[in-house]
Regions:
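A conserved nucleotide-sugar
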Residues: 38, 56-84
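Acidic donor-binding loop of glycosyltransferase active sites
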Residues: 88-101, 114
């Protein structure tokens, strides 16, 4: 929304990241997995909005080709608490194909040290003035691009520890709920 409103209401808009309460998250930098565990959560009523209807068949194709190197944890319509538990063993989470930025689910995954495949466009980093951290494996809404990015992480799973550590650092740096609350208060006081 920021990108849409900023040109017209520049004095009334500010980009403030989504908050994550890091006290409620157990972070763990992932090691190089023997078998890469992909996690995809599917809400049947929203699959086409989140892009999981496009990502899942591509992920299944990668799993078929590299069954000795990866597995898939596929979760359908579970309560949020159960979703979080099932995500704990993941190395890589797929979410929000059409987004420019990570979703709340992706941020939660990143806070846990899970690498995210999804919305991580250059604009996401530019709006934060982030020039070094690049924890998100950005994918385009294109089956070939998704396949190439998934295949690449399967064949180069040695990247997982670095991406995992960057994910934790990214969320702590930009999405800590206390820092986000301060940004809201600062903006409110100025206006």
């Amino acid at each position: 929304y920021y990108a849409s409103y900023q040109p017209y209401f520049s004095d009334k808009t500010a980009f403030i990241p989504l908050p994550i309460d890091l006290r409620e998250v157990t972070s763990r930098v992932r090691s190089v997995p023997e078998k890469l565990n992909f996690f995809i959560g599917i809400q049947s009523a929203r699959s086409n909005l989140k892009g999981t209807d496009v990502m899942l068949p591509v992920l299944q194709e990668v799993r078929r080709k590299y069954s000795e190197l990866c597995r898939v944890t596929e979760v359908h319509d579970v309560p949020y608490a159960r979703y979080q538990q099932l995500m704990d063993d993941a190395d890589v989470q797929l979410d929000q194909l059409y987004s420019y930025t990570p979703s709340m689910n992706s941020l939660l995954a990143m806070a846990k040290g899970v690498t995210v495949v999804g919305g991580g466009e250059p604009e996401n980093y530019e709006i934060l003035n982030e020039t070094e951290l690049r924890p998100i494996i950005n994918v385009l809404p294109d089956e070939q691009d998704i396949y190439q990015k998934l295949e690449d992480i399967v064949l180069h799973k040695e990247r997982i520890p670095e991406l995992s550590a960057q994910s934790i650092e990214y969320v702590a740096k930009y999405h800590d709920h206390v820092k986000v609350a301060r940004q809201y208060l600062d903006f409110w006081k100025k206006h």
